A protein has these predicted regions:
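Compositionally biased alpha-helical segments
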Residues: 1-180
Length: 181
């Protein structure tokens, strides 16, 4: 695989910001590690993980923040669905891709081989929570739980920004970055 180093920075566990270059892979899945050089010409390549840094930014492209979050394991592709709702999860330190930075909340995504998940960090809290979207089968038919709609409505109510127009758009929202933004 060819290298594609772009200008960026990493934030260490002690909060130090180190400028350099990150091998930008235009990831389809959230990266578990990145390659970082302080100097583009003859810099030593460091492999950094969620254990060693809290954030990395590829300038003009993407920012990823490390968070320890529950990651739902329930499948959403029809061929993989089961009769029972899969509520299993694991807790892991992962790099969440920052999609929106707001005054009150930030929106993140996490994609792996199973599915995409969206997370909200309510700035009154310290940990993001997953916006819940589940699928299962019932008598061979697909059943979808759109719990993320109630989660978004509740958050808007707590902040006093809920109105008829907002509720209307939430009631039609699909589990996609475009709608959840």
């Amino acid at each position: 695989a060819q290298s594609n180093y772009k200008e960026g920075n990493v934030v260490t566990n002690t909060g130090t910001i180190i400028k350099g270059f990150i091998n930008y892979r235009e990831w389809h899945k959230n990266p578990e590690q990145i390659q970082f050089k302080r100097d583009l010409k003859n810099g030593e390549v460091q492999t950094l993980t969620a254990d060693s840094i809290t954030r990395f930014t590829i300038t003009g492209y993407e920012t990823y923040d490390r968070h320890i979050v529950p990651v739902s394991m329930g499948e959403i592709s029809f061929e993989s669905l089961k009769e029972a709702i899969d509520t299993s999860f694991f807790i892991k330190a992962v790099f969440l891709k920052k999609m929106v930075t707001g005054d009150r909340v930030d929106l993140y995504s996490y994609t792996d081989e199973i599915k995409i998940r969206f997370y909200v960090l309510d700035k009154r809290q310290t940990l993001p929570f997953e916006l819940v979207y589940r699928k299962s089968l019932s008598d061979g038919r697909e059943i979808t739980q759109l719990l993320f709609r109630q989660q978004l409505s509740r958050l808007a109510l707590e902040y006093g920004i809920s109105d008829a127009s907002f509720e209307e758009s939430v009631s039609r929202a699909t589990y996609s970055g475009k709608d959840i933004r």
